[in-house]
Amino acid sequence: MRCVLMVGLSGRQSSPTSIGNMTRALAVAIDGPAGAGKSTVSRALALKTGFALLDTGAMYRAYTWAYLKDRESYPHISIAESAIRHEISVTFDDGSTLVRCDGRDITRDIRSVEVTAAVSEVSAVAEVRDLAVELQRRTVATELSSGRGVILEGRDIGSTVLPNAEVKFFLTADPSARAARRGLETGQEVSEVIELIQARDLADSTREQSPLRKAEDAIEIDATHLSADEVVEVMHSRILDVASL
């Protein structure tokens, strides 16, 4: 069965009056390395603006989880072969992103240490990326045409997936701050998480398929000494400025 990524976007629709001077829907790209706080900030920004939220990283993590499970029964299966065996769905509603594989809720499972260690390898496979990127672009076009803004977070949204996005951010922080945030999520020691993050950074920035990089026209935000609320305010202000032009 060919893998079909289905993204359901429900919840309150945004309107021009819902966030001040907003006069048109926008595509917002939020890129950055692992542990920079992209997911937290994206969720808060989506709630603040009423925009739809597409967690692209969750899609790749879902493929990774499925691949790791497949290998338990089929040790020699390739990543591409695994991808086409499963139906992945990602839905957004009231600030929560739910991820399912063949109907099973794997929202928590995809944040495991094992998935984190393997996701760079899986997301670098051309067949996997082609499936995900095709859906991301199509979904954004549909939402914008309906008058609703869209927020996408990932590592190459502004540079590869949506190079024409009108608002682009690159969120970063020093490794120790990122490790502390991720450690709170996983319960791991910070020293252990730093090693994983540094390995992930190297893999993401040097891979052949769409490596991690800042888009030339992206606004870089260093969140090392900023709270999530402060980052959201900076982004929200920029969105209002662009939307009112």
Please identify what each model-predicted range represents.
Residues 18-21, 101, 105-107, 177-180, ...:
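NTP-dependent small-molecule kinase module
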Residues 30:
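Hydrophobic anchor at the beta1->P-loop junction of P-loop NTPases
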Residues 33:
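P-loop (Walker A) phosphate-binding loop of NTP-binding proteins
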Residues 38:
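Conserved lysine of the Walker
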Residues 41:
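Hydrophobic positions on the alpha1 helix immediately C-terminal to the Walker A/P-loop
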Residues 47-112:
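N-terminal phosphate/diphosphate-binding loop that engages ATP/GTP or pyrophosphate donors
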Residues 91-93, 136, 140-144, 155-160, ...:
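Small-molecule kinase domains that catalyze NTP-dependent phosphoryl transfer to phosphate-bearing small molecules
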Residues 107-185:
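ATP-dependent NMP and nucleoside kinases share a basic, alpha-helical "lid"
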